[in-house]
């Protein structure tokens, strides 16, 4: 039993030389876990407001639950904030001039987020046959996944984070990470999050099978819009949560109707 405990301690600490280093490692992990949660939630709110008031794809100005998950979080923003948080700690003092130093740092952050956005979009297109967003109408876009316009937005958001959020988030997160109840809070969030991921991936698997059988890439937002049209046709209530679910027909029949409308 003692030997098993030692082995578990070894792997948890990832070869830490002392208990203090192990504690530091776990604290950093909790900080990143919390930042992922904050980024996912903040990104969801940002997308919610953008789609409601500014998106050309929503002329009726309805509230639309963004992303493919049910809950109020977007993992893309969570991963992006973790990367931006880590980049905010790098030493760029070798660059002369304060303004140039910050410009290079923010550009590095923006390009990093753009790369995350690109690979995330590519994974869904190649792996799931689903396109979650489409920048095809934007100038100089690459495969409709990324474009200079949104890279510029990431640059602005990186600057806002660095000057307004990062100085305060360091103290608050370190305080939270030092409290035991915080670990429970993080665990609760990830428990709900993983259940949501499982439910949403089941929907995506159905979409993937249909898309592969018909050799198409399903435009997720167009399909969501089609679901809304079917909901109106069947006189069902609009759903902000579980927006891909219909009471009268299955997801497979919804996909068939979507295919007949947009691809035939």
Model feature map: region roles:
Residues 3, 10-12:
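Short hydrophobic alpha-helical segments enriched in small aliphatic residues
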Residues 3-4, 251:
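Short linear sequence motifs
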Residues 5-7, 192:
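Short linear motifs centered on Gly/Pro in flexible linkers and helix caps
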Residues 8-9, 20:
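Intrinsically disordered, low-complexity segments enriched in small/polar residues
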Residues 21-264:
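Aromatic-rich, lipid-facing transmembrane alpha helices and their immediate juxtamembrane interface loops
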């Amino acid at each position: 039993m003692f030997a098993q405990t030692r082995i578990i301690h070894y792997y948890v600490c990832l070869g830490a030389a002392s208990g203090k280093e192990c504690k530091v490692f776990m604290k950093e992990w909790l900080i990143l876990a919390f930042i992922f949660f904050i980024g996912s939630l903040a990104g969801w709110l940002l997308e919610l407001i953008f789609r409601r008031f500014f998106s050309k794809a929503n002329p009726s100005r309805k509230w639309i639950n963004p992303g493919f998950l049910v809950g109020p979080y977007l993992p893309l923003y969570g991963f992006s904030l973790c990367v931006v948080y880590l980049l905010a700690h790098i030493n760029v003092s070798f660059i002369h001039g304060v303004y140039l130093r910050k410009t290079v740092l923010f550009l590095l952050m923006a390009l990093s987020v753009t790369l995350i956005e690109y690979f995330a979009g590519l994974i869904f297109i190649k792996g799931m046959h689903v396109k979650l967003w489409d920048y095809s109408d934007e100038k100089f876009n690459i495969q409709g996944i990324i474009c200079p316009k949104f890279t510029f937005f990431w640059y602005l958001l990186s600057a806002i984070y660095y000057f307004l959020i990062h100085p305060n988030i360091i103290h608050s997160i370190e305080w939270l990470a030092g409290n035991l109840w915080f670990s429970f809070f993080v665990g609760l969030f990830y428990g709900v999050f993983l259940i949501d991921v499982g439910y949403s991936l089941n929907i995506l698997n159905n979409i993937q099978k249909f898309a592969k059988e018909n050799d198409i890439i399903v435009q997720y937002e167009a399909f969501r819009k089609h679901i809304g049209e079917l909901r109106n046709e069947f006189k069902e209530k609009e759903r902000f949560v579980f927006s891909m679910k219909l009471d009268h027909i299955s997801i497979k029949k919804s996909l068939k109707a979507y295919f007949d409308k947009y691809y035939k």
